[in-house]
């Protein structure tokens, strides 16, 4: 698991439209990188819609939202369209999730993405880590952590 002050690992992943997105594309901005298990599931929908509803507040704090799950871009596109999600959803890989400590054993749910969020500062350093995230109210929790 990454710690505050660590350099956030670089990645290059596809977005909803198949476009390559790198973490370094966002240097100079704060990044909310949130890992979620699956598109269109109850908790993940609550979490994504709360980020959507608070998006202007994040923009006012020079922050971008990046959602990460291991769903493909077709699934992401349907999820984004269904819920009006205006931020980037990344087609994540197990390798990248492991680098961020967001992949592992979830007990009775088996192995997969563990709901985790990283606040990454303008220079690419981890500013905050949120583990075992509760979907409801998480967006507000993140906003309070942004300076």
What are these language model-derived features?
Residues 1-147:
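Chalcogenol-based redox active-site neighborhoods
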